[in-house]
């Protein structure tokens, strides 16, 4: 008995006019996820999936390329307006936001949803360069 042929199921094209872009920019990478109003993922991309490795993932250019990729995927689903939620301390925040605006989306609101500890976990040690 051989392997059964696995059928590749194509994602059906949803027609969603507005959504939420979650831009998570850490010190190491930038991930961008576009969801509908309920939080269901429509499209996502990151600097790592765009072929950037190592320290190049954390650059603003890598975040811009990832934002252009995810906007192309989301526009295939008919998305036109976005609310943007930006989180994290990384360098790709502004460039990802500019790339989403340049892709033709109407950005209705921009929110910073970075979590701030009320003296929670102990932070990592200071870098000595």
Swiss-Prot record:
GO (cellular component) term, any one: cytosolic small ribosomal subunit
Matches recorded under InterPro entries: Ribosomal_uS11, Ribosomal_uS11_bac-type, Ribosomal_uS11_sf
GO molecular-function terms, A-Z: rRNA binding; structural constituent of ribosome
One record GO biological process: translation
Keywords annotated in UniProt: Ribonucleoprotein, Ribosomal protein, RNA-binding, rRNA-binding
One Pfam family linked to the record: Ribosomal_S11
Transmembrane regions: none
HAMAP family, alphabetized: Ribosomal_uS11
Oligomeric and partner information: Part of the 30S ribosomal subunit. Interacts with proteins S7 and S18. Binds to IF-3.
Record family assignment: Belongs to the universal ribosomal protein uS11 family.
NCBIfam families recorded: PRK05309.1 (NF003698), uS11_bact (TIGR03632)
Function: Located on the platform of the 30S subunit, it bridges several disparate RNA helices of the 16S rRNA. Forms part of the Shine-Dalgarno cleft in the 70S ribosome.
Protein name as catalogued: Small ribosomal subunit protein uS11
Taxonomic placement: Bacteria, Pseudomonadati, Pseudomonadota, Alphaproteobacteria, Hyphomicrobiales
